[in-house]
């Protein structure tokens, strides 16, 4: 017989919660002012025209319009918004 009582030890419970990062509105999709376009850690995507950036590097729309992704110099990826008035005309 065992001279010590068996004590269970859990090896689970260490996983951190997912942060739900990534692109939320893709290129060509319509968005409204204030909509979050990209959640990211650091500047994986840089703000272009009509895009604001929060203190946690979240990119958001400043105007209503269509989302546009483009590659700038040195392979920098930019997100911009083509305003709704420009797309209608």
Swiss-Prot record:
MF-aspect GO terms: structural constituent of ribosome
GO term, biological process aspect, one: translation
Gene Ontology CC terms, in alphabetical order: cytosolic large ribosomal subunit
InterPro entries in the record: Ribosomal_bL27, Ribosomal_bL27_CS
Key words, A-Z: Ribonucleoprotein, Ribosomal protein
Membrane spanning residue stretches: none
Family the UniProt entry places it in: Belongs to the bacterial ribosomal protein bL27 family.
NCBIfam families assigned: L27
Name under which the protein is recorded: Large ribosomal subunit protein bL27
Organism: Bacteroides fragilis (strain ATCC 25285 / DSM 2151 / CCUG 4856 / JCM 11019 / LMG 10263 / NCTC 9343 / Onslow / VPI 2553 / EN-2)
